[in-house]
A protein has these predicted regions:
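Catalytic cores of DNA base-excision repair glycosylases
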Residues: 2-221
Length: 221
């Protein structure tokens, strides 16, 4: 284990002491998780949930979403924003899955080699590394580490990520730093750190539990 991995584990353990071990939420079926994560893009959790619940209220099944008039899907998911983009995208993905698999059952991804499952998901337009990792980790309990904007910002400031590394490159890189059994808790606790303390603007460095392990120098002007 290299020094950077040791540092990542130390940071993880400190966050566990401060925030606790996150409780595993009841996993959504993979198609539900996929749609929910697409809806979450460029919006907050509240708006994502409003759109997801509206979609499930209006349409009894994902097959019904797939076959619905696009304008009706767009209307249902409007709370999530970018509905004119997300609505057709969700329907196209549902159609493509059905054409290839014969149904909307994605449970087969649990048995594929991890990288094959990841590649299968990211073939679809609108499904990037983060969306694929969320489906794999949260729904299928696969060892994938999703990197959102909070995690990308926090790990960059801390010094876990090399300078100029892209968010896409950060996914496999952080998977190599953190042990697989820590992915779920590390993901959620780093997000919490980013939301509550390590803000994009004016991070609350004096109250940061990992400030002694952080490379970031706050601006004083």
């Amino acid at each position: 284990m290299n020094k950077l991995s040791q540092r990542a584990i130390k940071i993880h353990n400190i966050l566990l002491d401060v925030f606790g071990q996150p409780t595993w939420r009841t996993p959504l079926p993979p198609v539900d998780e996929l749609v929910s994560t697409i809806l979450s893009q460029n919006t907050n959790d509240l708006n994502r949930d409003r759109a997801f619940n509206a979609l499930q209220t209006k349409f009894p099944t994902w097959e019904a979403v797939r076959d619905a008039k696009t304008k009706d899907v767009i209307a249902a998911i409007r709370p999530a924003g970018l509905a004119n983009q997300k609505g057709p995208r969700i329907q196209k993905i549902l159609h493509a899955i059905t054409e290839e698999r014969g149904s909307l059952d994605l449970s087969f991804l649990k048995d594929l080699p991890l990288e094959e499952a990841r590649s299968w998901l990211t073939r679809f337009k609108g499904v990037g590394p983060k969306t694929a990792a969320i489906v794999l980790c949260f729904s299928l309990n696969r060892p994938a580490f999703p990197v959102d904007t909070h995690i990308y910002r926090v790990t960059g400031r801390i010094g876990l990520l090399p300078a100029k590394m892209t968010v896409e490159q950060a996914h496999p890189y952080l998977e190599g730093l953190f042990p697989p059994e820590t992915y779920y808790a590390a993901h959620l606790n780093l997000i919490r750190l980013g939301r509550e303390i390590c803000h994009a603007r004016k991070p609350d460095c004096p109250n940061c539990p990992i400030r002694k392990l952080c490379d970031y120098t706050p601006k004083t002007t």
